[in-house]
Amino acid sequence: MSTTRYDIISDTHGFLSPELIEQLRGADVIVHAGDICSPSDFQHLEMIAPVQACLGNNDWSNDYGPTVKARKIFYGSGLRWQVVHFRERLNLLKCDVAICGHTHTPFVTRDEWTGTLVMNPGSPTYPRRSKPSMGRIICDEDTGEVLSAEIITLGE
């Protein structure tokens, strides 16, 4: 079985902790749901793995290149992925996996109406109602199945 590891982050706000960098090593793809707040951090992430990212409400003055916009749609592991900063802007009818940020509060769930996997990885920098966190999704490349989706608490 061939798998792909997607490491999911959001709301790093210009700081990539050593614990976060260590967790990201070995990722096949890094998905960032906005509020990167640092072009140099974005470049650092790109040195670890390919990055699929969207802009957050604090990113508009930064230039991360032409592929980073308010909404990121990409295909990976046979699945349609959608990444936006605000959960309210997700269109769950048009994706299999939906990633959001902004609240700094982690969760992972399946939408009961569409069956879409929805994740907010929380924030590794400024968590709210939780500890610093990120997400991880493992997909089967042959079947397009999500094998696991979890929130990882950093620093434990």
List each language-model region with its residue ranges.
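N-terminal active-site segment of His-dependent metallophosphoesterases
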Residues: 1-51, 59-70, 131-133
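Glycine-rich loops and low-complexity Gly/Arg-rich segments
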Residues: 31-36, 55-58, 77-81, 106-109, ...
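Short, structured coil segments at secondary-structure junctions
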Residues: 47-49, 94, 114
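Active-site environment of divalent metal-dependent phosphoester hydrolases
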Residues: 14-18, 37-41, 58-64, 88-92, ...
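Active-site neighborhood of phospho(di)ester-bond hydrolases with catalytic His/Asp-centered motifs
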Residues: 8-10, 29-35, 52-57, 82-85, ...
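Binuclear metal-dependent phosphoesterase catalytic core
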Residues: 2-5, 73-76, 112, 117-156
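Helix-adjacent hinge/juxtasegments
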Residues: 52-89
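Structured loop/turn residues at beta-strand edges in well-structured enzyme cores
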Residues: 25, 93, 144
